């Protein structure tokens, strides 16, 4: 075993991390031609990530643990767009309520072109910590996942980035629009690989 491993694990102790499986409930997220729902994949990867982080002594919170949205009752009669906004606002409120050090939002990508593939991180262009954390997680994803060669990118105008005071990174775990990748994203072993890569990226960032 690597001698530095205990030291690296220790960096997560006492850190409060909010894991946010994107979408849920009335919001399926991306849906591919085989009716794979992004919300389900997000939750499976997030739950595995929670296990890895909890074992390292971090204080872990989840925005959801079941197939539910986070629209408060007061907004449930609003138009869908306003419900989506309210759902995101609840996620931000949770990050503040838990006094989270980091908010990791787990998603899957999809575009009208089947050729694109790979897991990719996005960061808040106004937050240097968000950028550095996204780059560390991206580096880990590229190291752990065969053929993954994407780079961390800023994402302008994202509601989470514009409104969360917590250092936030969005992780798009792959493309549901790519048949081969969407098939892998359903496999527990691949979900574990993704979760492990995210976990190690966070470790590496904190160990720097």
Model-derived segments and spans:
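Catalytic-site microenvironment of enzymes
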Residues: 1-208
């Amino acid at each position: 075993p690597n001698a530095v491993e205990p030291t690296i694990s220790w960096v997560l102790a006492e850190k409060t991390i909010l894991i946010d499986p994107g979408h849920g409930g009335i919001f399926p997220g991306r849906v591919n031609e085989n009716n794979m729902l992004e919300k389900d994949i997000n939750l499976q990867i997030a739950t595995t990530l929670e296990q890895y982080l909890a074992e390292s002594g971090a204080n872990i919170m989840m925005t959801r643990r079941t197939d539910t949205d986070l629209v408060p009752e007061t907004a449930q009669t609003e138009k869908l767009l306003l419900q989506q906004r309210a759902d995101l606002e609840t996620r931000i409120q949770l990050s503040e309520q838990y006094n989270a050090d980091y908010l990791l939002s787990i998603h899957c990508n999809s575009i009208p072109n089947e050729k694109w593939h790979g897991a990719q991180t996005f960061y808040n262009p106004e937050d240097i910590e968000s950028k550095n954390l996204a780059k560390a997680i991206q580096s880990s994803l590229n190291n752990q996942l065969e053929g993954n060669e994407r780079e961390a990118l800023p994402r302008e105008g994202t509601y989470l980035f514009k409104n969360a005071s917590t250092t936030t990174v969005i992780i798009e775990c792959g493309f549901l629009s790519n048949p081969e990748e969407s098939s892998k994203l359903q496999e527990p072993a691949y979900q574990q690989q993704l979760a492990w890569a995210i976990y190690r990226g966070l470790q590496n960032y904190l160990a720097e």
